[in-house]
Amino acid sequence: MEKGLVSIITPMYKGAEFVGDTIESVLKQTYTNWEMIIVDDCSPDDGAGINVVKRYADPRIKLIESKINKGSSGARNIALKEAQGQYIAFLDSDDMWPEEYLESQILFLSNKDVVIAYGGVQRIDENTKEKISSPFPRPDRVDYKDLLKVCPICPSATVYDLS
């Protein structure tokens, strides 16, 4: 485990249309100590999403091509086995982060006894890229009992501290 490193876990299935935007949002992060592990989950798109990922020469971006479709959870688990970071962040291949997302989450996680940081989510029109709703509300505090009932936290808006 590398202290301070964020391992960004990105499952991809037929991701050619949006994965470039996803990667661009990571490249624009003000917090730059990250690795991005993208797992293509045996997409039936003749490698279109894989080709988009391969256009990026940044050594922090790693591509794993799964030969068996395991679903998004299975793809995340493949990436987790490769992750080297103190922090784990999930980001689906059709989601994007604002530029200061990682920086704000890591700053929050630097507080004593905090192991999970999460933020709100905003829907964006896939054609126009315009915001189509106000941000989904996020609870101020989530405890273990809340997580057992229903998880109010979006995976793509969550960072975990493994230390």
Regions found by a protein language model. Give the residues of each.
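Nucleotide-sugar donor-binding/catalytic module of glycosyltransferases
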Residues: M1-S163
